[in-house]
Regions:
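Acidic (Asp/Glu-rich) sequence patches and key acidic residues
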Residues: 1-148, 152-162
């Protein structure tokens, strides 16, 4: 029996410099309770090798983490502080339904998201997580209205695929 693909959308505001921010102010400003919210925390794992010696904190090696300098590998990591609003996994054959749902949640709050990002030096991200068989992916179309909406929020859009 074929399984319907699933999509989960995650909107995240992240502080990438190793410091915390007023996550409660984000909740108040947006009027949305976060699904998850976390201060900077030490990563559980360590980076064995990044192809170069790490002498200063490096955010480019591992998304969501800063790799901290050390005398030699393994390098410790620090998970960035973040605030996120996630939709539950949805069985769907196209991205449009969950995308519209998240956009409705944030509609009218675009300027507030940009203000919070500026005030607290945050990065806005929309992550589209797709759970599917490799030969049964959903339709992943970003209509022009959605592209304009996420651009107005200042969000980077990325896709994570979890394939069977």
């Amino acid at each position: 029996m074929k399984q319907t693909p699933q999509i989960r959308l995650v909107f995240t505001l992240t502080k990438r410099d190793g410091t915390d921010f007023e996550r409660d102010a984000v909740t108040r400003g947006l009027g949305i309770s976060p699904t998850r919210s976390c201060p900077p925390t030490p990563g559980k794992g360590k980076v064995q090798h990044s192809g170069k010696e790490i002498r200063e904190p490096d955010e480019q090696v591992l998304p969501g983490f800063t790799v901290l300098p050390a005398e030699a590998p393994p390098y410790p990591t620090l998970r960035h502080a973040y605030w996120s609003a996630e939709l539950p996994k949805m069985d769907c054959r196209a991205l449009d339904e969950p995308l519209q749902q998240l956009e409705q949640m944030l509609c009218g709050k675009e300027a507030e998201v940009r203000r919070l990002c500026e005030e607290y030096s945050l990065y806005a991200d929309l992550t589209v997580r797709v759970f599917a068989a490799s030969n049964d992916l959903p339709e992943l179309v970003l209509p022009d209205g959605s592209v304009a909406f996420w651009a107005s929020v200042g969000a980077t859009v990325s896709f994570d695929f979890y394939l069977d």
